Amino acid sequence: MLAKRLTTYILIALVLGLVVGWVTNVAIGHGNPTPDQAATLAAVAKWLGLITTIFLKLIKMIIAPLVFGTLVVGIAHMGDTGALGRVGLKSLAWFICASLLSLTLGLILVHILQPGAGLNMPLPAVNAATDIDQSKFDPIQIISHIFPSSIIDAMAQNDILQIVIFSVFFGVAITAVGERAAPLVKAAEALTKVMLQITDYVMRLAPLAVFAAVANALVERGPEVIGKLGYFMLCVYIGLALLWIMLGLLAWLFVGRRSVSLFRYIREPVLVAFSAASSEAAFPRTLEALDRFGVPSRISSFVLPLGYSFNLDGSMMYMTFASLFIAQAYGIHLDLGTQIFMLLTLMITSKGIAGVPRASLVVIAATLNQFKLPEAGILLVLAVDHFLDMGRSATNVVGNAIAASVVARWEGGIDPEKPAEIEPPHAPSHGLGGGR
């Protein structure tokens, strides 16, 4: 009942945030704020943003030790490195297929819906500054950055991919050492349970954070920003909705009828990701939801962190729409071959860049330059990026939950055959040491 109440509270907070943000903007700015009124709105938004920032920092505080603990325990109970390699290859195969699905669907929809054609609003000058730091987009630097020089630094920076690399080495070494490393496995199990309990405490703040995040987005920007780019936003959300349907059909194909109940189990983390515009904020709850659904923790603890770097289906859809929308807005014709090559470039360059701030915009900016498109076009979508980030973050959670479920099925089934009742999340009572 507590989990259902929390979901209800988050929905109420979402609606209240929309109303309060909208009313505050209109009451202070009257639709066309003076410099003083704009400063007042910015100050209100700043205080609201503080609440969201605190919540997201508390979530990030949990992620590093939780990823480390669950992954080490999961690898230790796999029993051999062959199983680890098999799960890794199956995960990457699914990630690539899901990315291609997102790109293809996005490409088709952009041509059908034409979100940028005949855009009736002034375009930014082609040389306008975007404040996007492309120096962070260096393929050699990105590949080098995957490997940690210090696990302390990786955890301090909350770099999931580096934590995964260290945890894999640590877990494999524990398996090789055998019984002498058993105390370390028990310590990792205890760490996981403690972090899940902390997650339960932090999530009680979720409704307040959701209210602040949504109100903050509307207080400063106002409702008119949605109207100006409403059709583009509608097109993106149509694409995300169709992607949900297609991923759901694939889940039905590989997981069976139980895939329908998966959406009930992940509804809370999906709602958190949507409201906070952060798939990272939903990571701990997604891990718990998959555990209750029956995905062995040795699978979910490996697939989910990898998915946060390599399986961002919602972000792939958004980048497809944004890139081709900008080309259409400037009246630049790209032949089909160029478009396909550009989208494949997006797919390759987006892998492993999740730790970069505003990662999607960095990838889009670099890709636009490579294909001689005006980088300034990003300014068109920047104003509504937060509202689109809500949808793509929720989609990323759905995509990774389905990925973990499918890989679990490929690895011999989802246990138990009858999922646990949807109840208040807590540290799994069956223990992570039971071979799951």
Q: Residues of each region from the PLM?
A:
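Signature of multi-pass transmembrane helix bundles
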Residues: 2-3, 7-11, 18-23, 44, ...
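Membrane-water interface of transmembrane alpha-helices in multipass transporters/channels
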Residues: 40-47, 85, 187, 223-231, ...
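Hydrophobic transmembrane alpha-helical segments of multi-pass transport and channel proteins
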Residues: 58, 96-100, 237, 241-242, ...
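Membrane-interfacial loop-to-helix junctions in multi-pass transporters
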Residues: 60-61, 139-140, 158-163, 199-204, ...
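Transmembrane helix boundary and interhelical junction motifs in multipass membrane proteins
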Residues: 66-67, 206-209, 278-286, 299, ...
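Juxtamembrane helix-boundary/capping and inter-helix hinge elements in multi-pass membrane proteins
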Residues: 76-83, 118-119, 177-182, 190, ...
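Helix-loop-helix junctions within the multi-pass membrane cores of secondary transporters/permeases
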Residues: 268-350, 404, 416-428
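Hydrophobic alpha-helical transmembrane segments of membrane transport and translocation systems
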Residues: 357-423
